[in-house]
Amino acid sequence: YKILKGLVYRALFFCMNIIHRGIANKKLKENCFKSFKESFNKKYGIETDIHFTKDNKIICFHDFTLNRLFKINKSIKNLTYDEIKSNTKLKISVPLLKDVLKLSKKRYLVLIEIKPILNLRNIKILLNEIKNYKNCIIISFKHTNLFKIRKINKKVKIGFSFAKNSKILDIIKTSSKKNYDCLILDKYFINNKSIQNIKKNKYFYTVKEKKEFLKYSKKNNLIFENL
């Protein structure tokens, strides 16, 4: 049983293509409950972003403010979850991470990107929230978040994120660290031999064209959108 269980979890993290912020189209908005549900229904994993509200609720939302999606110039960190719901209820619902995790049914990979730099208290809240979900990987461009996590928890899955302007030597140096699970890399690096030779699971973002998806998806883990 343990062997079979291990194989199931291994399958979650290999040859996997992930939908960026859930399915988004004319009917569905990014990082909303319905977009995640539709993604899971199509048997895809998801990537989502998280922020903490003023009352320490973890929400799935990309931006630091409500301005881009809702034309409301207010910061997430300065609003309670009820205030966010009140401000956005006529457009889309901003989901709690715990509800999205339940929706995944522990079957589909969930990449959880920490957007801000978190304090230790919030790190502990996040770890407690995901403790029963082995289908999660916590990722961040702000690597200090991941170092804090490792000091508290040696087993939770983590991944270092890198932008297009990252130096290859920095990526390789980070990849030599122990006790992490994957790298999240801009697709700019997908044809780089030094990067491909790194013996760690890698996810390349963000693929937006079907032709590009078909070209690379057989041999790479891709984070894609709107295909």
List each language-model region with its residue ranges.
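Phosphate-group recognition and catalysis centered on beta-loop-alpha active-site segments
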Residues: 4-227
